[in-house]
């Protein structure tokens, strides 16, 4: 089905219901002076609740979101929401950017204008992009899957068809978190259609094809130990979402404060903010993302992607290798990040950038740094590329 324009919905009734629920929150106790040691801080969450109930303006947020061009397109019977903003130049490079969890397409709003209109924002006017930012199935305004199996491999297939439907025979891909997995699979499964891929995260399930019993260098063994320890110390959320997301859904889909605590804790822990999440994200930014999950009732369907990922991890089979050019942008406060040689076992790494600051939510935290790296990488590939199929 051809893409059709989409209007971001707004409901006064839904806002009234949200405020009623916030006002009736049944608060737990907490051990005094423990802050975030046991999870989301009680005083912080009470402050967030007051702001959300009394001052947060969802209608204004919808108006801001609606300044972008939104569409929906049915791909393999799944309705996919996406933003499409055309580049302000004659040779715009098609670029699909995929978000992760617990983010949404909202993560990319700051970076879109930097890529579509670089001349206006101090970038190289010769390198601009047609930017496509879809919502993953089960997130935001995209449909939820009605059958098991909606994993990152299937999503990459949907994205390839979506870009074909938009008229892009060849394109570039970028992503972090689940978006890094989807972009990797696009490079792995559709190399003839890819100009290259740019990643600011390496999926935790990634394993290159290794010989049975292969002895790894200590730097790689050390990384794998650190990653395992990270999941022991900080991965409780992931274990629940990988194993029993439906059980978690009854709490998060019913209580807005439970939902906010579940999501905002991750922004605090994963961003480069030294434990003060409002150093990087305003209350409005945090709550716009949480409210999107609340209004669309998609927290449980988004968590299912972890369940599906456990059954379909990014483990390369013998002979599998991402041969298209790949750029890695390493932000220093990201979760345990593999050494370059571990990544190069599975990827054709042609650019590696050590960023001076930033964490897991790179597009939202450091849009200028990320946009510059994306433009430099794909701009160079575009100049060197002899195949014009990436253009419409």
Task: Give residue spans per PLM region.
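Alpha/beta-hydrolase
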Residues: 1-16, 21-22, 26, 195-291
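Short beta-strand element of the alpha/beta-hydrolase
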Residues: 92-100
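Conserved hydrolase catalytic core segment
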Residues: 114, 118-121, 128, 166-222
